[in-house]
């Protein structure tokens, strides 16, 4: 995995952690992840993303997840987008 891709994937998870915690939750509250990968992402790099993901999520009980390859994302230059669903107690 190229350094820019690794850095971007790391940044996406760091941002996700900030968002979940701002909502009063923790990363273990995430029950579903949808990964959207732009066509520029080498599909051979997808398995290499797992160690980064594993630093943020409970590897013993990971959330359900789906990977979707798309022609492009909302903004030029975006390569990875993650949609998360979390079950956060009040």
What are these model-predicted stretches?
Residues 1-90:
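Short, polar/acidic, helix-capping and beta-turn segments at strand->helix junctions
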